[in-house]
């Protein structure tokens, strides 16, 4: 067993760029915190792994090619591998717990990331 503590304390502050902090990585899973200040632009590329986002704090929306959904504390969103997605309309500093399966980078990239 490994207990992770403090993941909810990581967060980008106003004026800082979005950032990623990895907390755990094993072959089949990785977990980290992705933080985006209010008004920032999310420039991430699609990943080769399935993702689950759990919003810890803040408000915004997650947009894919097919839909846009408002998210806030407690929102849980599944994004399948390869799907284009970005956080948009970030109106409050946003911190999300991100789970990748398998671990981020475990699959070969097909998008030139």
Show where each model-derived region lies.
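A short, N-terminal "cap"/entry segment at the start of jelly-roll beta-barrel domains
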Residues: 1-33, 43, 109-113
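Short hydrophobic/aromatic-rich beta-strand segments that constitute the beta-sheet cores
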Residues: 33, 62-64, 96
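Short acidic-glycine-tyrosine-enriched beta hairpin
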Residues: 66-81
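Short, conserved beta-strand element in jelly-roll/cupin
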Residues: 36, 46-62
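Short strand-coil-strand connectors
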Residues: 27, 63-67, 90
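Ligand-binding loop in jelly-roll beta-barrel domains
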Residues: 81-106
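Structural motif
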Residues: 52, 59-61, 68, 84, ...
């Amino acid at each position: 067993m490994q207990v992770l503590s403090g993941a909810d304390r990581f967060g980008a502050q106003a004026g800082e760029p979005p950032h990623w902090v990895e907390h755990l990585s094993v072959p089949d899973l990785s977990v980290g915190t992705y933080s985006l200040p209010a008004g920032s632009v999310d420039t991430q590329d699609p990943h080769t792994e399935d993702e689950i986002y759990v919003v810890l704090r803040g408000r915004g929306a997650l947009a894919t090619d097919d839909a846009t959904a408002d998210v806030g504390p407690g929102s849980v969103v599944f994004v399948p591998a390869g799907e284009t997605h970005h956080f948009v309309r970030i109106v409050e500093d946003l911190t999300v717990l991100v789970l990748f399966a398998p671990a981020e980078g475990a699959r070969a990239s097909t998008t030139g990331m």
